[in-house]
Amino acid sequence: MLELNKLYNMDCMQGMKEFPDGFFDLAIVDPPYGIGIDGQKKRVCGNPKHNRKEHIRKSWDKAIPPLEYFRELERVSKAQVIWGGNYFVPYLEQGHKGWLVWDKGQHGLTMSDCELAYTSFDTPTRVFVCNRVELLNDGTIHPTQKPVKLYSWVLSLFARKGMKILDTHAGSGSSLIACYRQGGLDFVGFEIDEDYCRAANERLEQEQARIRLFDLLEQEERKAQATLFTE
């Protein structure tokens, strides 16, 4: 079995076979939608700051994953949150009402105003407003990158300490960074593209270093305060 708390450069179909049934408490995934995102124009409106960042065209979004992917995802995880669920309706279990909506906070552009996520939870539909400009703060490395804040929101809804989280298409690594920030969660990510995986691992390592430094500074501050009280 593969180690936890790592992002692997491998095909998720092979990776999921490494784990027993129901190993992960929650899968939060963002598979290809099959809409040819690399073929969409970079210019999205008259305001240059809203334009897409130029990314290497890799032609990974030509088709949605096969049915076998969704069955394997359901096998290895107890619950699922699947971004782009509206593209995969024939493959998903029907009857669940707990859809999520990411309102991008920028309306009237050539891209969609929002994105939908299917969930396996019977909960009310929830909406999260997070402007795409937030990606500028994260640092954009992937054409369909989602903000870390969006994943943090999803985790706040469905994840609890001690859970194991899976992301089969980690892309920029935003979901894994959100897991690390929340604390108390184990995670596994897969990314088949070597370039994206390398960049995502760099982002994750930077986040881990930042939090370690913050924790160290906090410890030093507590020690200094304790010394003041004992003098």
What are these regions (language model features)?
Residues 18-29, 33, 37-58, 68, ...:
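Class I S-adenosyl-L-methionine
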Residues 4-14, 212-215:
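Conserved SAM-binding strand-loop segment of SAM-dependent methyltransferases
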Residues 1:
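Conserved P-loop NTPase mechanochemical-coupling segment
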Residues 6, 57-62:
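Short, flexible loop segments at the rims of nucleotide/cofactor-binding pockets, characterized by
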